[in-house]
């Protein structure tokens, strides 16, 4: 583990999520969320429309299922180097079970997410296999300041609110993040966090910017891409040692909630491992809450 990774892990472990896993006490009944989010960096524009429906059994247990739709627009440089064109398509359909607990000061949540391989592997929208992610989140409130932390284990790296990744992976990973947010006003919050993805064992890296060709899938490729950049920039599907799939970085953001059921957010993420500078943005709409508030 290099020095940058150790620093990020320390930041995560000792930091006193803009988007907590349980941002408020859930209302019992059916839920319906729409979220559109994206990332812009040196490799292109990566956006996703995510539709989720579910049911809150009570304040402690909820179930949900959803389907993301991806839109990938490679940068001019990527198109020139590897000939990639724009691509759209569905991702993996997923199901979730979430356990929650809350007091006046602390929120905790444990979420199990399982996906089925419905996305196109050649476009990088799926690993071609079912995936499982178990994430555990907490936050503590001290007035306007809310530190948070999360640790999880999975067999594939996932996108986050801060980073729509230009790739996905197959193989065991541990992921951690931590930081804090500050409530500037009733509808405005800012925050910062650090994250780390720590793989174990060989990893299959599947690119969303390098398309599959007759010779691009190499089960034993050791290509390291260009310099500090990731193999996913030039190779569509390759098996690499864990070090080449490791990632760590930092994020900062602003969130505005003009209404109880609508969130706008945007910010910056720096992947120090892959030298990627990403501007991210998104809008989330709690359609279920809007419908209930209108008495439908």
Describe each PLM feature range.
Residues 44-50, 74-81, 110, 120-128, ...:
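Outer-membrane beta-barrel translocator domains and adjoining extracellular loop/strand segments
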């Amino acid at each position: 583990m290099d020095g940058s990774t150790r620093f990020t892990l320390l930041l995560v472990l000792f930091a006193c999520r803009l988007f907590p896993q349980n941002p408020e006490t859930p209302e019992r009944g059916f839920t319906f969320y729409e979220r559109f989010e994206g990332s812009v960096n040196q490799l292109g524009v990566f956006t996703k429309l995510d539709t989720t429906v579910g049911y809150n059994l009570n304040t402690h247990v909820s179930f949900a299922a959803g389907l993301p739709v991806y839109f990938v627009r490679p940068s001019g440089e990527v198109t020139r180097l590897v000939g990639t064109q724009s691509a759209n398509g569905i991702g993996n359909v997923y199901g979730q079970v979430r356990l929650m607990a809350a007091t006046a000061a602390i929120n905790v949540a444990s979420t199990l997410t399982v996906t089925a391989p419905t996305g196109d592997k050649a476009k990088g929208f799926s690993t071609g296999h079912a995936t499982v992610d178990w994430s555990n989140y907490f936050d503590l409130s001290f007035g306007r300041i809310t530190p948070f932390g999360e640790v999880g284990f999975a067999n594939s790296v996932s996108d986050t609110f801060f980073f729509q990744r230009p790739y996905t992976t197959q193989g065991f990973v541990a992921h951690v993040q931590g930081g804090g947010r500050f409530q500037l006003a009733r509808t405005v919050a800012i925050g910062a966090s650090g994250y780390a993805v720590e793989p174990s064992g060989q990893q299959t890296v599947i690119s969303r910017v390098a398309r599959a060709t007759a010779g691009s899938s190499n089960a034993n490729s050791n290509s390291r891409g260009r310099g500090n950049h990731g193999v996913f920039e030039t190779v569509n599907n390759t098996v690499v040692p864990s070090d080449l799939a490791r990632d760590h970085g930092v994020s900062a953001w602003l969130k505005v909630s003009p209404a109880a059921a609508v969130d706008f957010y945007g910010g910056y993420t720096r992947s120090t491992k892959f030298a990627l500078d990403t501007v991210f943005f998104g809008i989330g709409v709690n359609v279920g809450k809007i419908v209930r508030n209108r008495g439908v």
